[in-house]
């Protein structure tokens, strides 16, 4: 049986969450916590169970809307992988709103570098962010800034995201996203991974 579950905070339920995950495993359900899990709440016991769950699309979803959540996601991913999980991770990533261009770019680019490391090392467990442009709840008709649309267009197309860094992405004729980095005073990598070869070089924390 396939189950799409909309609870975005099941791990906050403590022992009840443990019971539900154990039932899911015992009954062989294939599940998707569609609204994402909270990586901050993943402990050793949860990690062990999450690694055993049969996931729809072989994918676990987390949220990564701030720089601080990068550490939380990395910790949760390492714990779950430590129990034998070999599937993918899908990270909802809000861009815009309280996060300016620089913060949004550096947070998403962190996962681009991270995913590049995983792919070039032939390791399991690809990590894909999913960029969600901020929508003002008080003004739903407010136009989304062009940079948010372009960043989402780059991030959310896996076939492009896997092989093209943001500065080389061309969302339309005669425009390359390198222009955004110049505009916001961010150093442009010379070619792909020449200047940034590992996540340790991204001083994001």
Residues of each region from the PLM?
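Core AdoMet radical
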Residues: 1-76, 87-97, 126-130
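Auxiliary Fe-S-binding modules of radical SAM enzymes
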Residues: 98-205
